[in-house]
Amino acid sequence: MMVTGEAMGCVRCIARCHLRFDEKKKQMDIEAVKEIIRQGDGLSNTLGMEFLSTPEPDIVRARMEVNDRNKQPFGFLSGGASLALAENLAGVGSMALCPGKVCVGISVSGNHVKAMAYGGVVQATAHLQHKGRTLHVWHIDITNEEGDLISTVQVTNYIITPRKNG
């Protein structure tokens, strides 16, 4: 994958993020994740995703309330918002595992098995299935507060090593 021009500036910015798994604390630096979200006007901020602390480097958790920003016209959680939640979890997980690298989603595939009504809260848990040098594969389950499955998603991330020059 070739990254050039304005996109390369974004790649350099992302690569400087200090997002990592803290071996001493046995958790991801969730405050760094939250700060990245607060600084931007990206999709995770727009949809109201809240990242939660986790005890392992290969698991990422988040929650999201179903509201006007992420519902479909009938008042249920949009399938696209569910996929965005899953891809964001996988991206954060890959970034934490690969400090100084850029992680981009190249495949997202999901199945929606139950509706989630307006005002409800979904919880998502991403588990790393494969950690290669250039590819990570994550499995994400999105559930309601009772633990019922709402969506199940697989995300593949491509890991990019930024060029050192310019």
Regions found by a protein language model. Give the residues of each.
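Methionine residue identity
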Residues: 1-2, 8
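Terminal targeting signals and extreme-terminal segments of soluble enzymes
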Residues: 9-166
